[in-house]
């Protein structure tokens, strides 16, 4: 859904790195580990926050509960 703002374990801010992470993966064609290292995420707890995030917001935006089905 929404990227967590802080790491659950250590409290470091990780929410501002999500867009940069996606850009590094797509435009620079880096692997996940290298991209996380370039973003300055050294601790495995912080790396976990980015690696395991599932971005579901686009699916929820398409859902309209007021729309009638035929």
Swiss-Prot record:
Q: In which residues is Zn(2+) bound?
A: 7, 10, 45-46
Molecular-function GO term, any one: DNA binding
Residues joined by cross-link Glycyl lysine isopeptide (Lys-Gly) (interchain with G-Cter in ubiquitin): 59
| Localization (cell) | Nucleus, Nucleolus
Which key words are in the record?
A: DNA-directed RNA polymerase, Isopeptide bond, Metal-binding, Nucleus, Ribosome biogenesis, Transcription, Ubl conjugation, Zinc
Question: Does the keyword section mention Membrane?
Answer: no
Q: Where are the transmembrane segments?
A: none
Swiss-Prot/TrEMBL GO biological process terms: nucleolar large rRNA transcription by RNA polymerase I; ribosome biogenesis; RNA-templated transcription; termination of RNA polymerase I transcription; termination of RNA polymerase III transcription; transcription by RNA polymerase I; transcription by RNA polymerase II; transcription by RNA polymerase III
> Where is the major localization of this protein?
nucleus
Any one GO CC term of this protein is: RNA polymerase III complex
Highest taxon listed in the record's lineage = Eukaryota
Q: What Pfam families is this protein classified in?
A: RNA_pol_N
| Keyword Metal-binding on entry | yes
The record, for HAMAP family, names: RNApol_arch_Rpo10 (MF_00250)
Which family is this protein grouped under? Belongs to the archaeal Rpo10/eukaryotic RPB10 RNA polymerase subunit family.
What is the documented function of this protein?
A: DNA-dependent RNA polymerases catalyze the transcription of DNA into RNA using the four ribonucleoside triphosphates as substrates. Common component of RNA polymerases I, II and III which synthesize ribosomal RNA precursors, mRNA precursors and many functional non-coding RNAs, and a small RNAs, such as 5S rRNA and tRNAs, respectively. Pol II is the central component of the basal RNA polymerase II transcription machinery. Pols are composed of mobile elements that move relative to each other. In Pol II, RBP10 is part of the core element with the central large cleft.
Quaternary structure annotation from Swiss-Prot or TrEMBL: Component of the RNA polymerase I (Pol I), RNA polymerase II (Pol II) and RNA polymerase III (Pol III) complexes. Component of the RNA polymerase I (Pol I) complex consisting of 14 subunits: RPA135, RPA190, RPC40, RPA14, RPB5, RPO26, RPA43, RPB8, RPA12, RPB10, RPC19, RPC10, RPA49 and RPA34. The complex is composed of a horseshoe-shaped core containing ten subunits (RPA135, RPA190, RPB5, RPO26, RPB8, RPB10, RPC10, RPA12, RPC19 and RPC40) where RPA135 and RPA190 form the DNA-binding cleft.
General remark:
Present with 5300 molecules/cell in log phase SD medium.
Name of the protein in question: DNA-directed RNA polymerases I, II, and III subunit RPABC5
In its UniProt entry, the species of origin is given as Saccharomyces cerevisiae (strain ATCC 204508 / S288c)
């Amino acid at each position: 859904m929404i990227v967590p703002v802080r790491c659950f374990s250590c409290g470091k801010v990780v929410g501002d790195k999500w867009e940069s992470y996606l850009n590094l993966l797509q435009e620079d064609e880096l692997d996940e580990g290298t991209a996380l290292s370039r973003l300055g995420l050294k601790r495995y707890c912080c790396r976990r926050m980015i690696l395991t995030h599932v971005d579901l917001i686009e699916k929820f935006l398409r859902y309209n509960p007021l729309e009638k089905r035929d």
